Amino acid sequence: MASVWFNQEMRQATGFTGTVEVEGTNIRTVIANLEHLYPGISEVLIYEDNIMPGLSVIIDGNIGSIGVLEKVNENSEVHFLPALGGG
């Protein structure tokens, strides 16, 4: 199962308390399984069937580029973080 992490800001926004192990072969199924554990969490993570604008998904240290279709391995570490902007 993948380990899913949120930063402090996301924990407060979602009520998510820390790290959780969930099954899933891609981000879409990981989020669906998170929704079973934490009803309503998909409203913070998903917008129009993709990752919420302003949110980044990091899988095993790599920033995802294809949204909910990103592959997740059995032992992956998944982080949902607010996207960083710069100028």
Residue ranges, per PLM feature:
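Ubiquitin-like/PB1-type beta-grasp interaction modules and other compact soluble beta-rich domains
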Residues: 1-86
